[in-house]
Amino acid sequence: MTFQSINPASGTPVSSYEEMQRAEVSKIVEQAHSAFLGWRRTPFRDRAVPLKKAGQILRDKSKEYGRLMAEEMGKPFKDGIAEAEKCATACDYFAEHAEKFLASEDIATDAKRSFVTFQPLGVVLAVMPWNFPFWQVFRFAAPALMAGNAGVLKHASNVPGCALAIEQIFKDAGFPQNLFRTLMIGSKEVNAVIEHPLVR
């Protein structure tokens, strides 16, 4: 199967990508899990550094991302720029506040001391829609990565370029290799990913 993004205004092809086979998808999940094993032990202040860098990349390239959204799914150019900038704000926000949000909470019980602690889950699958192709992903990815998780993304099939651009942002920002990956798969393959023993 080939994924092809079509400019909705002109009907012309923008790009095309081959669907990943299950063996490749499984390998990506395993690589993401390996990256997670180190990332989960990374202090919040160190997790925040690449997330803030991701925010800066989004700002610096907001016009490029706005153009990509316009080409793949028809979002007005200025709205795409605003969406990229909103994603940057989310990156900054979670980089600055995640440690406070995830601090252990003391609770009253009969025990000498009781508390709730928040621990990373592992590799988290995100299945995302096309209408806000950057925002829907970053509103998941920014807090998920700051919480110490890894992420794999199955984006809508009409915005493959956006999906790969987002993966590249996390790479360029300096996150560990394979911590966030895009899966080029169709909807029928999602259940197989959900059932993978390393996906949480």
Task: Show the residue positions of the predicted features.
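Rossmann-like NAD(P) dinucleotide-binding subdomain of oxidoreductase/dehydrogenase enzymes
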Residues: I107-R200
